[in-house]
């Protein structure tokens, strides 16, 4: 019985001390300032994590045979999600050919290499002129290359 009473008193003492420390009773001003600094640091870290830098890319175009163009794209995603970077093909002006755009599949975070082709003959129409491939992130062109066909 005495052991139970002693354990109960010890438990109450520990609970009382713990409540004082969480309520800020009896603590020093340094401890309060430290808690504020910790909260500010956590907020700053959260804001930095939310502010992801935009990806970087390089694109180069080569002619393949009579009617294809190949775009080789190197991308550093900088922690941006899959589908955030797009490849946009611009057909020559006045050629009556279609522009296309699609997301680039992310295989690696840095130095991700991918490629895509476009056919310069659409139906009976041969789309001669200046073809441009743009790498786009958040409606901003981050890399571009052109070739004359």
UniProtKB/Swiss-Prot annotation:
Domain of life of the native organism: Bacteria
PROSITE patterns associated with the record: PROKAR_LIPOPROTEIN
Compartment list: Cell outer membrane
Signal peptide as annotated in the record: 1-19
Lipidation (N-palmitoyl cysteine): 20
NCBIfam families tied to this protein: OM_lipo_TUL4 (NF038367)
Topology class, membrane: Lipid-anchor
Organism from which the protein derives: Francisella tularensis subsp. holarctica (strain LVS)
InterPro entries from the UniProt entry: FN3_dom
Lipid group attachment sites (S-diacylglycerol cysteine): 20
Protein name: 17 kDa major membrane protein
Gene Ontology cellular-component terms listed: cell outer membrane
Keywords from the UniProt entry: Cell outer membrane, Lipoprotein, Membrane, Palmitate, Signal
